[in-house]
């Protein structure tokens, strides 16, 4: 099998499974739908692992070829092609591996769904195909296709329960917010096409960069900026939408309206990593603009810290994990801004495993609670759901950066990158990611203690209480006990727990300090020496653990865990008093910094008001009633006046004739004697 065939199979097999499940779902049934989609993703996962292994043992070389030319227009070729290198191979394994776990898990989680079972499997398999096309692309056109495809499928999946108003609102919100980011992304691609050599293929664009190194572009009359800086910022606007960076992050928490498996897939391995992958892939461009990198770093720092604060007050078990995703995406963005692209991609990988684990473990707890998602109704689930308890503990330990867990190696590396960066804004970024360590540990173990320890709070609730999640989410009765989830749910948890512990230790040296990303990621070491300094400081994974004993990071994490234990295990009455004492801050967090209100009341309502103005004033009053109907009325009015002259009496016509003759005579004499 040649390389082209291999890569086509990896990309297209999930699409084939999606089409079969979607078009023939009623004929093949539920078992047929999940079998064909799982088989397709499993084939892709195995072949992706084979490709990655080839890169690791040196038997596989970088592949960059076009599959076919889609369109030729004005000397410009729009092609479909694959660029498969070490970064692509790593992402292929992450995407297909996590997707496979999600597919298997979905069999148990969606077991009781009466309708839409086949449709859901079709969607998640299509989601996998879309992400593969994005990461395997060798040109901006295919990148944009995958970019829009993951956006479309996420819209369908977030709104899977389309009869719920909250779900339809959430998927429309995600779609519209991402359109804002995509508009900037499209403008950036337009600049690349117009000024970077007239090609959209990555290798051609990168080769042309020296020709535009000092080029400027006029933004406004008398205002010129660096062409590369403007291009980088516009491309990053797209990343802000897809990877949910402040202030385009507001769609991500509401994506929890979709079923839990798709929450795991969106947050761990697909849509939210697209923007981070794109910036890393475009490292040769970004390395030419320190201004753009500073902006990226500051935005990532704001996202990491301030989204973490919002996770502290959440009571929905899935929303806690959602806000942790926002915060962790901020960490990765800080790494990008510090020119530590390899560190960002390393955290993308480790985060994918432990975040998928956390979401799926949360879903398992939700199953045990009869689909009640409110943590205030849980407690002591450790007694009833030991596998879910242990795997969520592992996920949280990795999330907060506990030594020897995967998240420790990647998260601490990001903090070190911010520390060593010399760009403007790096001081704020270092403070933000450092403070986020405490915040992350606090909300992660607040969730853990509320769910798995303490009193069994559902026993004090009314029977079949309403928790605001719809009729099917009725919760446990007073005398009911939670139950451990079936093997089809717990097996993916166990399998994801393994890389959540060991993958960081295995991968840190080759990915960050070896040559894994050689010739894939470009860093201008003279202008941005962060990685060069970190390489000198790194003496091995175990030495990194030893170094953490002298770092504030470990002690901030411990302080966060102890604070959560004190407030939610030893003194559970205290959080309510603290919230009351700091009521203004709590209300600010509860309203998510009022950004949703700003967007809804100013931008959404403002746009509708502007549209209403143009409709009523511009279209109806000026065009319809003014120009169109007004001209008709004018003709009618003139005709009505002229009609009065047509009386039918001879003396009227004679008087008109005499008047006309007098006018003509007057004009004649005026001309003669003037």
UniProtKB/Swiss-Prot annotation:
Query: Among the entry's GO cellular component annotations, what is one?
Result: plasma membrane
Q: Which domain of life is it from?
A: Bacteria
EC number(s) per entry = 7.1.1.-
According to its UniProt record, this protein's enzyme class is translocase
Q: Reaction(s) catalyzed by this protein?
A: a quinone + NADH + 5 H(+)(in) = a quinol + NAD(+) + 4 H(+)(out)
The cross-references to PANTHER family, in alphabetical order and at most eight, read:
NADH-UBIQUINONE OXIDOREDUCTASE CHAIN 5
One of the entry's Gene Ontology molecular-function terms is: quinone binding
Keyword tags: Cell membrane, Membrane, NAD, Quinone, Translocase, Transmembrane, Transmembrane helix, Ubiquinone
The text of the family note is:
Belongs to the complex I subunit 5 family.
Mind telling me which residue stretches traverse the membrane in this protein? Answer: 4-24, 36-56, 67-87, 90-110, 115-135, 140-160, 180-200, 219-239, 259-279, 293-313, 348-368, 385-405, 425-445, 488-508, 549-569, 653-673
Its function? Answer: NDH-1 shuttles electrons from NADH, via FMN and iron-sulfur (Fe-S) centers, to quinones in the respiratory chain. The immediate electron acceptor for the enzyme in this species is believed to be ubiquinone. Couples the redox reaction to proton translocation (for every two electrons transferred, four hydrogen ions are translocated across the cytoplasmic membrane), and thus conserves the redox energy in a proton gradient.
User: What's the protein's topology in the membrane?
Assistant: Multi-pass membrane protein
Q: What is this protein called?
A: NADH-quinone oxidoreductase subunit L
Return the InterPro entries for the record.
NADHpl_OxRdtase_5_subgr, ND/Mrp_TM, NU5C-like, Proton_antipo_N
């Amino acid at each position: 099998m040649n390389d082209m065939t291999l890569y086509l199979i990896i990309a297209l097999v999930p699409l084939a499974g999606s089409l079969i499940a979607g078009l023939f779902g009623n004929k093949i049934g539920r078992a047929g739908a999940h079998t064909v989609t799982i088989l397709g993703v499993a084939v892709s996962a195995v072949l992706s692992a084979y490709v990655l292994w080839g890169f690791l043992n040196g038997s596989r070389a970088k592949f960059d070829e076009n599959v076919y030319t889609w369109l030729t227009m004005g000397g410009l070729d729009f092609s479909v092609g694959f660029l498969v290198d070490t970064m692509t191979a790593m992402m292929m394994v992450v995407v297909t591996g996590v997707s496979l776990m999600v597919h298997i898990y979905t069999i148990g989680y969606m077991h009781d769904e009466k309708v839409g079972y086949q449709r859901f499997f079709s969607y998640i398999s299509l989601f996998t195909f879309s992400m593969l096309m994005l990461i395997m692309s060798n040109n901006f056109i295919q990148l944009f296709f995958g970019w829009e495809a993951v956006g479309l499928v996420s819209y369908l999946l977030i709104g899977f329960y389309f009869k719920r108003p909250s779900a339809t609102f959430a998927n429309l919100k995600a779609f519209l917010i991402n359109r804002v980011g995509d508009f900037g992304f499209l403008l950036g691609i337009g600049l690349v096409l117009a000024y970077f050599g007239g090609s959209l293929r990555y290798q051609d664009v990168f080769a042309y960069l020296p020709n535009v190194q000092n080029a400027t572009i006029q933004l406004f009359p008398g205002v010129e900026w660096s062409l590369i800086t403007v291009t980088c910022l516009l491309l990053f606007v797209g990343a802000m939408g897809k990877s949910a960076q402040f202030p385009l992050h507001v769609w991500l928490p509401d994506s929890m309206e979709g079923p839990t498996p798709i929450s795991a897939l969106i947050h761990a391995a697909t849509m939210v990593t697209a923007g981070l992958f794109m910036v890393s892939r475009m490292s040769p461009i970004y390395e030419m603009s320190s201004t753009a990198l500073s902006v990226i770093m500051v935005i990532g720092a704001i996202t990491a810290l301030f989204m973490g604060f919002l996770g502290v007050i959440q009571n929905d078990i899935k929303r806690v994990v959602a806000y942790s995703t926002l915060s962790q995406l901020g960490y990765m963005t800080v790494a990008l801004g510090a020119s530590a692209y390899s560190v960002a991609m390393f955290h993308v990988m480790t985060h994918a495993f432990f975040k998928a684990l956390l979401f799926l473990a949360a879903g398992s707890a939700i199953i045990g609670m009869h689909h009640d998602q409110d943590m205030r109704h849980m407690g002591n689930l450790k007694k009833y759901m030991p596998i879910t308890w242990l795997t969520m503990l592992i996920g949280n330990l990795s999330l907060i950066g506990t030594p020897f867990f995967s998240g420790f190696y990647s998260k601490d590396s990001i903090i070190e990158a911010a520390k060593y960066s010399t760009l403007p804004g790096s001081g704020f970024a270092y403070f933000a990611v450092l403070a986020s360590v405490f915040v992350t540990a606090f909300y992660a173990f607040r969730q853990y203690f509320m769910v798995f320890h303490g009193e069994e709070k559902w026993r004090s609730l009314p029977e079949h209480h309403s928790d605001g999640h719809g009729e099917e989410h009725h919760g446990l009765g007073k005398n009911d006990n939670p139950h451990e989830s079936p093997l089809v749910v717990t097996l993916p948890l166990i399998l994801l727990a393994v890389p959540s512990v060991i993958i960081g230790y295995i991968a840190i040296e080759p990915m960050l300090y070896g040559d894994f990303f050689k010739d894939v990621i470009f860093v201008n070491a003279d202008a941005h020496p962060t990685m060069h300094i970190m390489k000198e400081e790194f003496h091995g994974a175990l030495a990194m653990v030893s170094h953490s004993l002298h770092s504030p990071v470990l002690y901030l994490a411990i302080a966060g865990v102890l604070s959560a234990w004190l407030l939610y295990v030893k003194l559970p009455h205290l959080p309510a008093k603290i919230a009351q004492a700091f009521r203004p801050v709590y209300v600010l967090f509860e309203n998510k910094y009022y950004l949703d209100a700003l967007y809804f009341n100013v931008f959404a309502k403002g746009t509708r008001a502007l549209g209403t103005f143009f409709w009523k004033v511009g279209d109806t009053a000026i065009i319809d009633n003014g120009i169109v109907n007004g001209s008709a009325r004018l003709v009618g009015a003139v005709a009505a006046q002229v009609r009065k002259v047509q009386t039918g009496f001879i003396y009227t016509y004679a008087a008109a004739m005499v008047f006309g003759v007098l006018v003509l005579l007057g004009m004649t004499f005026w001309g003669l004697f003037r």
